[in-house]
Amino acid sequence: MAIRILRALAAARRATSAIEFAIVAPILVLLATGTVGLSEVIRAQTDLTTAAQTMAQVIATQTLVTTAQISDFCTGSLDEMVPYSTTGLKISVASVTRGATSGTVGLDWHNESCGSGAALTSATTLAASVVPSNGDSTIVVQATYTFHNPLSLVLPATFSLTETAFARPRANTTVTYN
């Protein structure tokens, strides 16, 4: 009797699909969740890149910038991060020039008023390859953003994103800061 039941179970194929689905479904849910979470991180990084490049380009079109103007430009860059929260966004701006006679790269000015705790890590080192000739100047913008992943089932709950953007002054001179 027991052998007959075992043979009947071995020959049965009707529940095979249900068992396969029960095994594969959790894996598919994890993959889908991870894909959505990763695409959100990539989109946040893309928005951060746009915010940094926009800030650099807008400042590079000026010949003179003030703290109030940089604050206004910062507000515009914050809008680039929509629909994400901007509480974790910090943007630092600097102007770097290669000396006309010495050839050494020096910091003209920097502003860290866009986001509390913003810090530009070694602007002169970052911009050294962008200002190859004596007298060349560039605007360096470094944006950092702490992205909070709403789908932290597969990926980490937070990501620290950083983007650096460079822009040459349009007037072919150094952008002064007042």
For each feature predicted by the language model, list its residue ranges.
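Alpha-helical assembly-interface signal, strongest on the long, hydrophobic N-terminal helix that forms
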Residues: 1-79
